[in-house]
Design a protein with these regions (language model features):
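Short, polar loop motifs at secondary-structure junctions
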Residues: 66-72, 89-91, 110-116, 341-348, ...
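Structural motif
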Residues: 61-64, 81, 106, 374
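Catalytic binding pocket for nucleotide-activated donors in carbohydrate/polymer assembly enzymes
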Residues: 10-17, 23-35, 39-44, 100-104, ...
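Membrane-proximal helix-turn-helix segments that form the acceptor-binding/catalytic region
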Residues: 90-106, 193, 197-202
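N-terminal pre-catalytic "stem/leader" segment of glycosyltransferase-like enzymes
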Residues: 1-79, 271-296, 307-314, 318-322, ...
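A short, active-site helix/loop in glycosyltransferases that binds the activated sugar's phosphate group
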Residues: 107-124, 326
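Nucleotide-sugar donor-binding catalytic core of glycosyltransferases
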Residues: 6, 14-20, 24, 122-382, ...
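Active-site proximal beta-strand in glycosyltransferases
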Residues: 75-90, 106-109, 124-131, 152
């Protein structure tokens, strides 16, 4: 399709320089091309100064950024519409989030905004946008595959929670906080730096006492029910805060970061990718590199306090780990023919023999989907329509996923697919029974895969996502 006078000119910026992020933004750009709009996908995030200049040079009128809002200090050209596409749950401790939006902006989330933890009022349109699949993925089903396996799971698992008690470090932390409580002086930036210089070799910058971490862990294990897709990060985070009330006020608030920035030059742009390595370091080399890169010398602007970072981990990442540990243990009761792919699995000793590494290319991932009799999927908050789910279905792979009370909400499986027809559904109580039934019925698995692939082609290509965005921009 050719462009016309009303065609948009769109710039799409990933969250990270990673194969997955690059594949997603390129797929969306191709979707825009298919419906007649110019779109350019960047391979990596760029500085706000560069983004504003690129909009001018390329005559961009729409910017889509993954997991980013507008920069409040460096405005885009006035005619540019901004779209934030958040693909992660929202941190419980996120402050000032609404300040990054204009009335003309759009915020998309990967699923239902409320379920994912968005609890602030925004001045702009808020909607849901799923990932899509491209024609190359659909065509991949024509390739032959061999060496079938009963079960596979492709995805990240957080490492196990391992911490050792250290009375020495806990006492140092206690004295450090006594110093902080000195009236007026204790909260000064100068004393904050002095304390960190004095204790930095004996006490990590983000240290949280063993007793606090243990209370947080026990709270989550008591409250969270794995493999039900009902995670409420606010409920868990608030519970952690209440139970940890004994330590309230013991965790220092980091001094505000001065948001005034220097304009980038060639040297700062060259060094910026390396500056992240030196966050929190106060040696001469670290300070010098971050200064030359025009970054805050000691930390990032979005750095959370140690207490808030621990809350985010236990309210978001720890439930994800519990889900996958429970799921794989259930699988091993059915069959030892199992392959696990992705980062994190090697850190779980009980699963190391099943870990086959991390797949770096899409073709390898699609091959695993096709040769697995059952592709395992789980989610903590009802987001069934993950990119892996859609890509697996697109090549005819068979998916098993647990039910969720959010299955009928945006991003839920029941918004597009029917259990028993397009995929296999299970609960924590009947996984083994359901898995055995699907393993023994090859024809039913094959039929479900074919029907799911047809549904993906008709509703979940990148061109469908591009059309949705164009329609939403005209609201």
């Amino acid at each position: 399709m050719t462009q016309d006078k009303t065609s948009l000119r769109i710039l799409i910026v990933p969250n990270y320089r990673s194969p997955y992020d690059q594949r997603m933004v390129k797929g969306l750009a191709d979707g825009f091309h298919q419906i007649g709009h110019y779109a350019r996908a960047l391979p990596a995030p760029i500085h706000a100064f560069e983004l504003a200049e690129m909009c001018k040079v390329l005559s961009i009128n729409v910017v889509i950024q993954v997991n980013q809002t507008r920069d409040p200090d460096i405005p885009l050209p006035s005619h540019v519409r901004h779209i934030s596409w958040f693909q992660d749950v929202f941190p419980e401790t996120l402050n000032g989030f609404a300040d990054g939006f204009h009335e003309s902006d759009i915020l998309y989330v990967l699923g239902d905004p409320g379920v994912l933890g968005l609890n602030v009022q925004l001045p702009c349109y808020v909607g849901s946008l799923m990932t899509g699949v491209d024609q190359a993925v659909i065509n991949h089903r024509q390739r032959s595959v061999s060496s079938p396996v009963d079960f596979s799971l492709c995805g990240f698992i957080p490492p196990p929670f391992v911490t050792t008690s250290s009375a020495r470090q806990d006492i140092l932390w206690y004295w450090d906080n006594l110093i902080r409580r000195i009236p007026v002086l204790g909260r000064s930036k100068v004393l904050w730096l002095i304390r960190k210089i004095l204790f930095r070799r004996q006490l990590p910058v983000n240290y949280v006492p063993y007793a606090v971490l243990s209370v947080m862990r026990d709270t989550i294990e008591m409250m969270y029910r794995p493999l039900r897709g009902e995670l409420d990060i606010h409920e868990l985070a608030n519970s952690i805060r209440k139970i940890s009330a004994l330590y309230e006020g013991s965790f220092p608030t980091l001094p505000a970061v001065d948001r005034k920035r220097r304009s980038p030059n060639r040297l700062s742009m060259l060094l910026k990718p390396y500056a992240q390595r030196y966050v929190g370091r106060r040696d001469i080399k670290g300070l010098f590199v971050r200064y030359l890169a025009a970054e805050n010398p000691t930390r990032n602007a979005d750095t959370l306090s140690p207490f808030d970072s621990a809350i985010n981990y236990f309210a978001q990442s720890y439930p994800r780990m519990l889900d996958r540990v429970v799921l794989i243990n259930d699988v091993l009761q059915v069959s030892k023919s199992l392959e696990l792919y992705g980062p994190g699995w090697a850190s779980h000793l009980e699963f190391q023999q099943y870990h086959k590494g991390t797949i770096e290319n899409q073709a390898g991932l699609l091959d695993v989907y096709r040769r697995s009799r059952i592709n395992l999927a789980n989610n903590t908050h009802g987001l069934g329509l993950h990119s892996r789910t859609l890509e697996c279905m697109a090549v005819g792979g068979f998916i098993m996923m647990h039910t969720s009370p959010h299955d009928n909400k945006p991003g839920g499986m029941l918004t597009s697919f029917e259990p028993g027809v397009h995929y296999g559904a299970f609960t924590p109580d009947n996984f083994q029974e359901e898995a055995l039934l699907w393993l023994e019925d090859k024809e039913k698995r094959k039929k479900a895969g074919l029907q799911a692939a047809e549904m993906v082609r008709s509703k979940h290509c990148w061109s469908h996502r591009a059309l949705q965005i164009v329609d939403d921009l005209s609201r």
